[in-house]
């Protein structure tokens, strides 16, 4: 019965992505919930790209909130879960005590791919070589969706091992591997299926690996990857945000120092967020993209400190 925190996962994850956060904040007295988003795990799989537009996913989350008998929640997102949470905050601020997001800053992917392109670090991604910068892979989804998802569907087990890797400081200042997807004609240098690489036990256990792979084998990658197919629709939806998109609720953003796709340290990617949040707290965790799983103690500490200082009235009594 404590204050409600809803954790929203990203691509290609599940509710178990928050397995290190749920017991932590539950033990502090919060009521903690982590759903599988539409297309994932035990949730409904829809068969049209447009079914995965942010407006529809936000409606799911508001429906979940109401089904839980709550008027407001603290919302926490990661990866595609971040645009979902940002959209809840910008369209339904009355449903938010506050919001926290990992890796993907506000006023970027929640407003479509074009909102990100103008913020690319062209020192790393010259425009003539990487027109979409680190977001080249998203352009490939739009141009050849079937080819984009084929290797993942061919071997979800290997896909999870290849994707869920810890941060690599040596890659700083170099193009992200996502920048080569369009040039290579697909993920994994255009291979028919992902390489068989060792599991990175700093990020996922063997049990986690099988849970992810089993769910993605059942449902396939059509639904999860359809999140990349609604940029124009999402931009139109974002234009209808209340208060001109300015967030006046408490906001926490946690950047991953070694996430070189959502690169927030040496780029302009966070500038629009800073201009559109009146109560923003920013933190940096030394991790790769999967920070809630790679560095759970640091993520939990950042979340707990923000909750205690920015939302003291919501802290469990």
Language-model regions, residue ranges each:
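Catalytic active-site module of serine/aspartate enzymes centered on a nucleophile-bearing elbow/loop
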Residues: 277-317
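Flexible "cap/lid" subdomain of the alpha/beta-hydrolase fold that forms the substrate-access gate
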Residues: 4, 40-72, 76, 80-280
């Amino acid at each position: 019965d404590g204050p409600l925190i809803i954790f929203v996962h990203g691509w290609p994850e599940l509710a178990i992505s928050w397995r290190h956060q749920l017991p932590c904040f539950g033990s502090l007295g919060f009521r903690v919930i982590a759903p599988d988003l539409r297309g994932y795990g035990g949730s409904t799989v829809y068969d049209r790209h447009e079914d995965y537009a942010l407006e529809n996913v936000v409606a799911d989350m508001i429906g979940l909130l109401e089904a839980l008998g709550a008027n407001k929640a603290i919302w926490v997102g990661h990866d595609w879960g971040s645009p979902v949470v940002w959209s809840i905050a910008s369209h339904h601020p009355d449903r938010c005590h506050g919001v926290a997001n990992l890796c993907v800053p506000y006023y970027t992917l929640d407003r479509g791919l074009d909102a990100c392109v103008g913020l690319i670090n062209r020192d790393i991604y010259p425009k003539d070589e990487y027109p979409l910068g680190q977001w080249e892979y998203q352009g490939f989804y739009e141009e050849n969706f079937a080819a984009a998802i084929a290797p993942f569907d061919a071997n979800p087990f290997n896909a999870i091992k290849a994707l869920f890797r810890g941060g690599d400081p040596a890659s700083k200042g170099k193009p992200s591997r996502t920048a080569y997807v369009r040039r290579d004609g697909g993920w994994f240098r255009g291979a028919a299926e992902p390489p068989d690489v060792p599991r990175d036990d700093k990020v996922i256990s063997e049990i986690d690996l099988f849970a992810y792979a089993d769910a993605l084998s059942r449902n396939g990658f059509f639904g999860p990857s359809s999140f990349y197919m609604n940029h124009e629709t999402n931009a139109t939806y974002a234009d209808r945000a209340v208060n001109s998109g300015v967030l006046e609720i408490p906001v926490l953003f946690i950047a991953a120092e070694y996430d070189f796709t959502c690169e927030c340290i040496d780029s302009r990617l966070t500038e629009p967020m800073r201009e559109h949040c009146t109560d923003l707290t920013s933190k940096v965790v030394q991790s790769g993209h999967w920070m809630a799983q790679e560095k759970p103690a640091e993520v939990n500490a950042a979340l707990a400190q923000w909750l205690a200082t920015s939302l003291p009235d919501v802290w469990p009594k």
